[in-house]
Amino acid sequence: NTSLMPASSGTVNVSYWDREYVSIPKLLKEQGYYAFSMHGNNGSMWNRLNMHKSLGYDKFYNYKNDFKIDETFGLGLSDKSFFRQAVPKIKKISEEHQNFYGTMIMLTNHTPWDDADKLDETLDLTMKYEEVNEETGETETKTASYLEGTTIGNYLKSVHYADAAIGQFIEDLDA
């Protein structure tokens, strides 16, 4: 939102949230836009409640205050639940404001990916390969659980899930 370089120590959101920033939300507000942000975690995480005000957002929707915690993944609300609950809020915003700008902060792709087994999207991480049977000379298809249960495998499952969640979100906004 600002194209700022990170702080040399600490974090901008915690150490420098009270500064004056040139940001996309502020620039768009000068053009008559309403700006909002939403996150499936609480507003105190990375001091977003204060920082988003400094960035010029009119409203910050967050985990504990604005969403029903009905499905968690990792650090907070699952992306599918987050988007499902965000759609009516965004539709209401679009009825009240001709021009608006929104930032949606997802959580599923955030480490750790230990909850990958909770995801309802299936991604086959099985490696398939062919091998010639020495006794018969025939080619056989074999499988191995190549990435199942690994960090990279869990990450790929979370990306697959997030992709499906974004697709459903877009469909729901269009409905």
Predicted ranges, named:
Residues 1-175:
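Solvent-exposed soluble domains appended to multi-pass membrane proteins
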